[in-house]
């Protein structure tokens, strides 16, 4: 196959097929390193996968990582002589990475360094879904106390498995709302092949809808992810290709966490190009039905908050709507939207002083916060573009 630029033609098979940006912004505080050690482990896992495959083929991989709150670096992973090395491309100072302009700059630097037919983004950080970081300033007290308690200890001193929610409500100065990320991608002019969130609570319908015009696919968890993050050594080969195999990536995640010492994890691959269609069906349902709050405790919860925020979307709609035609229409559209999903029998949460396990009896691959009575959800959900698109 040939493509042309001006009067020149070039064989597509000879050009860079894909560039992945591994984006790891600051996740701690001024005195605490947050997930930085875990990020270094993740990068080692990615490089292990690259060595196993004997290189990157016709793809390239760049890393943006914050070493402190105000110092970040852009590297390229180079494979040579059966090993990987990191070549420094640029040093950034300040915290512009929390802004749309800063995100656009990083993406533009990535494109200028490693032009490709396709671009993808892997985001490693804390995650609280679609919620607005400013709404967490004084809530929840227990989670803040937990963050302060655990940060005094090294990770190895803690007998319980940490998750990537840890610390995310401690300091909002380096937080980024999902709208800001979407706007940054939009400003860069890129449309991404996929975004993988190595963060807690990011496979929700509000996030997927917000990202629908900047990425084709979203890969994320509905629930908390262990602090070790995605099993990149196992998943990389499915994603670092011109045509990613989302089923294979989901299966690799599920296999890893099924056999992990804390065998808990959920994951979904979501086709964001279907989100407008899903919103249209949801609006039709909302026009005819109002949720019976007496059924709230019967919906599958996929988080560990004392007052839940993230409910299984399929289960919620099944309890909201009683029209067989609309239910079938919704389920058919949901199946087109969530192209692959997997879950262990239980999820794990470490938001408060003692971790808890929760049974999963049904799993659709997406969560929704419409029925939530959580303070943070109530402060923000009607501001989301998903809510505006699905409610009169």
Q: PLM features: residue spans?
A:
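Terminal, contiguous helix-loop blocks that mediate binding/assembly
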Residues: 13, 148-392
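N-terminal extension/subdomain marker
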Residues: 6-117
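Structural recognition of the beta-strand scaffold that forms the well-ordered cores
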Residues: 19-23, 60-65, 120-123, 193-197, ...
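Solvent-exposed, charged interface segments at domain starts and junctions
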Residues: 36-59, 125, 140-153, 275-293
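C-terminal motif of bacterial Sec signal peptides marking the signal peptidase cleavage site
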Residues: 2-4
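Solvent-exposed loop/turn segments at secondary-structure junctions
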Residues: 26-30, 67-71, 95, 125-131, ...
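Short, solvent-exposed loop/turn and secondary-structure capping segments
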Residues: 32-33, 74-75, 131-136, 207-208, ...
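Surface-exposed loop and adjacent secondary-structure segments within mature catalytic domains
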Residues: 66-87, 123-169
């Amino acid at each position: 196959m040939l493509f042309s630029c001006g009067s020149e033609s070039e064989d597509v098979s000879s050009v860079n097929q894909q560039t992945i940006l591994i984006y790891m912004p600051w996740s701690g505080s001024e005195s605490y390193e947050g997930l930085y050690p875990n990020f270094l482990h993740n990068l080692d896992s990615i490089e292990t996968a690259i060595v196993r495959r004997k290189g990157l083929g016709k793809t390239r991989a760049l890393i943006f990582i914050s070493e402190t709150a105000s110092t970040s670096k852009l590297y390229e992973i180079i494979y040579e002589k059966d090993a990987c090395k990191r070549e420094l491309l640029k040093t950034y100072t300040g915290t512009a990475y929390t802004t749309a302009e800063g995100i656009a700059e990083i993406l533009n630097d990535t494109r200028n360094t490693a032009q490709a037919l396709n671009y993808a983004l892997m985001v490693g950080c804390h995650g609280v879904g679609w919620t607005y970081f400013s709404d967490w300033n004084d809530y929840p007290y227990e989670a803040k106390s937990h963050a302060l308690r655990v940060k005094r200890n090294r990770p190895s001193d803690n007998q319980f498995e940490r998750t990537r929610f840890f610390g995310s409500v401690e300091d909002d100065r380096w937080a980024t709302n999902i709208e800001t990320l979407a706007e940054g991608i939009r400003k860069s002019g890129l449309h991404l092949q996929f975004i993988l969130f190595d963060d807690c609570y990011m496979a929700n319908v509000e996030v997927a809808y917000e990202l629908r015009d900047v990425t084709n696919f979203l890969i994320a968890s509905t629930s908390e992810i262990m602090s070790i993050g995605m099993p990149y050594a196992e998943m990389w080969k499915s994603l670092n290709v011109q045509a990613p195999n989302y089923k294979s990536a989901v299966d690799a995640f599920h296999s890893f966490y099924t056999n992990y010492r804390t065998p808990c994890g959920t994951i979904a691959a979501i086709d964001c190009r279907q989100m407008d269609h899903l919103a249209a069906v949801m609006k039709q349902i909302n026009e005819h039905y109002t949720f019976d709050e007496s059924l709230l405790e019967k919906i599958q919860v996929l988080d560990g908050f004392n007052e839940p925020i993230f409910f299984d979307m399929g289960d919620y709609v099944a309890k909201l709507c009683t029209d067989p035609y609309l239910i079938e229409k919704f389920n058919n559209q949901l199946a087109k939207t969530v192209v692959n999903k997997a879950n262990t029998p239980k999820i794990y949460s470490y938001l408060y002083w003692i971790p808890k396990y929760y049974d999963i009896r049904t799993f659709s691959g997406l969560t929704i916060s419409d029925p939530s009575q959580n303070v943070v959800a109530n402060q923000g959900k009607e501001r989301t573009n998903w809510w505006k698109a699905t409610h009169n």
